[in-house]
Amino acid sequence: MRTGSALVAGGAVLAAGAPLVASLQPLRRALTPAVLPDRLSGVSTSRHIALTFDDGPDPGSTPGFLDLLAERDVRATFFLLGRYAVAEPALVRRMAEAGHEIGVHGWTHRCVVRLGPRRLADDLRATKRVIEELTERPTRWYRPPYGVLTTHALVAARSAGLSTVLWSAWGADWRRGRSAAQVVTTVTRGLRPGGTVLLHDTDRTSAPGSWRTTLTATERLLDAWAERDIAVGPLAEHWVG
């Protein structure tokens, strides 16, 4: 494995050519939040849960999530891919007008390891520009596809004025054959107070039709959190207070 310049983050060394693959759950359990900085792992000191969705916008599925969140009066953070945002301007505007926070997920869903530093930096700036032009609001967050971190990804995000944030619990909802109950169980098992949840509002990079399972699971999770009087919202509210 090649080595190169490295960034030491809370004890974790992220070397160029030696990416930290945060999407591998055993590794995440070992690193988050024990090793990764709280902000990077999406962990706050409050009981607030940050609800986040990746890979949209998708006109075939995202509206269902927006409708559900509107019914429950809940806002979330959506990490968008630039190629789809530019193709669905009305949907992006609807997200923003509903009070949801919008972050950068990249121009496409390519792993950052496959992009050179300059290409990645250009992609992030282009995606941020599209989102900000459509929403007329500043964009703050970046989440790399697959949760793969490299030093050049962190540097590119910072140069674009973005803060990188991962997640502390997920539903593995992109997998084929998952039930809503399984997604809920997986989220609940990994979630702690102050955590950030990762789900997907589209099946563009997931198993076909998986978004329907995620939508049902999201409804059940919102019900459970409401019963426990746990505040749920976007990352913008996660470190407030």
Q: Which residues does each predicted region cover?
A:
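His/Asp/Glu-enriched short active-site or ligand-binding loop at hydrolase and phosphoryl-transfer sites
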Residues: V148, L154-L191, D229-G241
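N-terminal membrane-anchoring alpha-helices
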Residues: M1-L40
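Charged helix-capping and loop-helix junction motifs
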Residues: R93, L120-L124, R178-T185, W211-T218
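Divalent metal-coordination and catalytic microenvironments
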Residues: D54, L69, F78, I102, ...
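Active-site beta->alpha N-cap acidic-glycine motif
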Residues: P26-V113, R119, D123, V130, ...
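Hydrophobic, well-structured mid-protein blocks that either form specific transmembrane helices
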Residues: R114-L149, A153-A156
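C-terminal domain-boundary segment and adjacent tail
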Residues: L31-S44, V86, P208-G241
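A short acidic, helix-capping loop that chelates divalent metal ions and anchors anionic groups
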Residues: R110-L115, D173-R175, R204-P208
